[in-house]
């Protein structure tokens, strides 16, 4: 138990680095494996390998010593995420790639890194997802879905449904295929101790909260993925696996070149994603635009909808 300076006495989880009583500690909030808020007493000062405490690792999703699947290593974001995971001490990083006939210099550079293993993975192909899940699904501790298709324009500016169908096929149905094949086996391993499956990360968009007409069909596909991810979270929580949704603002990539700053670099997004894993949170909104939109959405969703349509 810990007695706060304000007077009340609390029952808390005690970090292994805390000095014997009587001693001062810092009390912080974390989520346990069921998603419930708990309090943890930490040492006043940082101690070596503080994040390696066994009890704390049960409450967070630190990739250190863990095996991670990144579903798309061809994108700049995917490559930045892979490098961030390696720097954080991931034991093994599987990197998915689709369309092998398309060359990617960034992917070749990743393959040369010691912890990286490339795996063919096409989220539009149920057979590809099923085969990859059969080969490595039982060993994945953290799944990070970075695969997405992003096209600009709304409804009236584009004829046909081909582009919107492709966005939905990757951004929504791709997530569904992953969830159907990887979800059950990861959920069954959520209580395997230090070798347990621990987290599933979805790269969404702040546009999932409120449609941005200039990126209308992309926004719709991310809104669908958000709804599906909430179902996935409910199912994965039963096994103690945390679902983390990342809602970045505009990313500095080829599809946002006409947008003015501020934009989020792939490295900044990867850093925010890594921190979300290490902190064990469920939702994170990286970047100034995402933070501003989130505040406006909380204040008045209807007002935000109207303002974005101007």
Name every feature range the model reports, one short phrase each.
Residues 130, 148-165, 188, 192-194, ...:
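Conserved mid-core segment of classical short-chain dehydrogenase/reductases
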Residues 90-106:
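Conserved glycine-rich Rossmann-like NAD(P)H-binding loop of the short-chain dehydrogenase/reductase
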Residues 74-75:
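Conserved glycine-rich cofactor-binding loop
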Residues 210-216:
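Active-site loop immediately N-terminal to the catalytic Tyr-X3-Lys motif
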Residues 179, 221-222:
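Active-site helix of classical SDR
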Residues 205:
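Residue(s) in the substrate-gating loop at a strand-loop-helix junction
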